[in-house]
């Protein structure tokens, strides 16, 4: 949905299916390519009689695209202790680097490929980027969105949606970082050694970088930020293609936020039953009458669905919709861990984004939330580094963690995890009933829920409103499937104190 992110972890959590996770291959359109990323796919029809493997043969070779300007590199011979070392050059890391450096503090950004344009596909609500003055970083917008509950029920969402221009967003951030004096180091951090007032980052090229504060912005690797509780999240899994098609049935002025219809599976009993147990939906961004981004998505499951299963469902759906793929510009494998415990709070390494547990546990949304949190992290770092009073490394990082995860944000996340635990238990009919009620709510409620703008008192009102809008069947499902998650949430809320 909002963030389609790679994870370096192997995919043992998938239903008996191991596959290397790829991300977008940002390339010019090619008609054919030899890249194969999956074995043992089903032979359901697509493009009339074409098999799913025939669709995959249209996937082009991966070609990495880099920014075309020079970066000021970190000079290890000087042995200086930088104020902030940011590990990871994604949106979250660069946003913090940019804002901390604007205050005149020294920053080093460490990433194995600092000039590589992000391979991830980001979709956001336009109002979220407008609030951060980032409208110039959207390369396509739609006046609204559509949700297909089933063949007879459609929801029209009057909320503009946009696709992030990855190159523009990264270029804008990098240029500001360069202007502010940020230095870059092309390497992977393999270890961090902490002393009282500084930390030493050991890189895989043998270079050691010293910093007062270390920020882990590496996504879901959890390589630097520590966890002390069992990690058992739900997983959002998706497969997407940016394709040239002969035609498609969607309104080019609206994106398809969710399509829960399953009429494309009526002739495949086994696949229809699988989809009924753990449903998937179509997410689509039509750029023109013959160019469209299509993605089959499992909202959340534990364990996550196998990529082969997702692709088989997508192929059946496209065939049923009469979408004949002529060529594929980019393809994307998406695996997003959702929910699970927060990292140890506080700890010496500061985190942001996926490594700090900031993915929305009910939706998989993160990019807008993370970019909005960047000033919070940056301001905390600036405040404590600029203080006349000397702080130890542990004191400083504890203060930053407190600002990133205040009690109201932790309570909000607990409610979102409660929502995820209910969604994990819903089959297709129950999921449809849930979203039928969800998108009937006043816009301020579903807007606020999806954009992480509601806090616990408002979330309680949101929950009561959702329950009142639900059908009797859906109310019964929420009560029976949500009782244990509700008890778990209340227990966690009572234990979590300032």
UniProtKB/Swiss-Prot annotation:
Q: Which UniProt keywords apply?
A: Carotenoid biosynthesis, Chloroplast, Chromoplast, Flavoprotein, Isomerase, NAD, Plastid, Transit peptide
* Record annotation: effect of changing residue 127 to A: Reduces catalytic activity 2-fold
Residues annotated for NAD(+) binding in this entry = 84-112
Task: Report the catalytic activity.
Answer: a carotenoid psi-end group = a carotenoid beta-end derivative; all-trans-lycopene = gamma-carotene; gamma-carotene = all-trans-beta-carotene; all-trans-neurosporene = beta-zeacarotene
- Substitution effect: residue 360 to A: Abolishes catalytic activity
Supply the InterPro entries for this chain.
FAD/NAD-bd_sf, Lycopene_cyclase_b/e
UniProt remark on cofactor binding? Binds 1 FAD per subunit non-covalently.
Q: What's any one GO cellular component for it?
A: mitochondrion
Which molecular-function annotations from GO does this UniProt entry contain?
lycopene beta cyclase activity; oxidoreductase activity; oxidoreductase activity, acting on paired donors, with incorporation or reduction of molecular oxygen
| Motif FLEET motif: chain residues | 293-297
Q: What is the extent of the transit peptide?
A: 1-79
- Necessary cofactors: FAD; NADPH
- Could you confirm whether the keyword Transit peptide appears in this record? yes
Location in or out of the cell: Plastid, Chloroplast; Plastid, Chromoplast
Q: How does it assemble?
A: Monomer.
Q: What does this protein do?
A: Catalyzes the double cyclization reaction which converts lycopene to beta-carotene. Catalyzes the double cyclization reaction which converts neurosporene to 7,8-dihydro-beta-carotene.
Q: Which PANTHER family match?
A: OS02G0190600 PROTEIN, PTHR39757
Recorded hits in NCBIfam families, A to Z, give:
carotene-cycl (TIGR01790)
Q: What is this protein called?
A: Lycopene beta cyclase, chloroplastic/chromoplastic
The species this protein belongs to is Capsicum annuum (Capsicum pepper)
């Amino acid at each position: 949905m909002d963030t389609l992110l790679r994870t370096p972890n192997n995919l043992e959590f998938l239903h008996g299916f191991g596959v290397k996770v790829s991300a977008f291959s940002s390339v010019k359109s090619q008609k054919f390519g030899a890249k194969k990323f999956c074995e043992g796919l089903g032979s359901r029809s697509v493009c009339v009689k074409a098999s799913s493997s025939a669709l995959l043969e249209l996937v082009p070779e991966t070609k990495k695209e880099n920014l075309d300007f020079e970066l000021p590199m970190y000079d290890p011979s000087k042995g200086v202790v930088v104020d902030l070392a940011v590990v990871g050059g994604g949106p979250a890391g660069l946003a913090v680097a940019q804002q901390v450096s604007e205050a005149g503090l020294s920053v080093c950004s460490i990433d194995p490929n600092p000039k590589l344009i992000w391979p991830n596909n980001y979709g956001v609500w336009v109002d979220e980027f407008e609030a951060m003055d980032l409208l110039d970083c959207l390369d396509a917008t739609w006046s609204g969105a559509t949700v297909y509950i089933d063949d007879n029920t459609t929801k029209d969402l009057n909320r503009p949606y946009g696709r992030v221009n990855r190159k523009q967003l990264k270029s804008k951030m990098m240029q500001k970082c360069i202007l502010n004096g940020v230095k870059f180091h092309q390497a992977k951090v393999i270890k961090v050694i902490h002393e009282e007032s500084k930390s030493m980052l050991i890189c895989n090229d043998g270079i050691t970088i010293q910093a007062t504060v270390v920020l882990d912005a590496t996504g879901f690797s959890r390589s630097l930020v520590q966890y002390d509780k069992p990690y058992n999240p739900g997983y959002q899994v998706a497969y997407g293609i940016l394709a040239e098609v002969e035609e498609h049935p969607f309104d080019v002025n609206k994106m398809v936020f969710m399509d829960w219809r399953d009429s494309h599976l009526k002739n495949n009993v086994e696949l229809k039953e699988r989809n009924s147990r753990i449903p998937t939906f179509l997410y689509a961004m039509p750029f023109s009458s013959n160019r469209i981004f299509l993605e089959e998505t499992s909202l959340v499951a534990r364990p996550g669905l196998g990529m082969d299963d997702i692709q088989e469902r997508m192929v059946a759906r496209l065939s049923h919709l009469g979408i004949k793929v002529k060529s594929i510009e980019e393809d994307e494998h998406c695996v997003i861990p959702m929910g699970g415990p927060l990292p140890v709070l506080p700890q010496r390494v500061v985190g942001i984004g996926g490594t700090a547990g900031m993915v929305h546990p009910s939706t998989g949304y993160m990019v807008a939330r993370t970019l909005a949190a960047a000033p919070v992290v940056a301001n905390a770092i600036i405040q404590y580094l600029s203080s006349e009073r000397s702080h130890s490394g542990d004191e400083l990082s504890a203060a930053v963690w407190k600002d990133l995860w205040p009690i109201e944000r932790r309570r909000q996340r607990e409610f979102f995890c409660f929502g995820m635990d209910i969604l994990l238990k819903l089959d297709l009919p129950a999921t449809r009933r849930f979203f039928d009620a969800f998108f009937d709510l006043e816009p301020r409620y579903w807007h606020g829920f999806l954009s992480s703008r509601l806090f616990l008192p408002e979330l309680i009102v949101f929950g009561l409103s959702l329950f009142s809008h639900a059908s009797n069947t859906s109310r019964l499902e929420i009560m029976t499937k949500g009782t244990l998650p509700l008890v778990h949430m209340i227990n966690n809320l009572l234990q979590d104190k300032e």
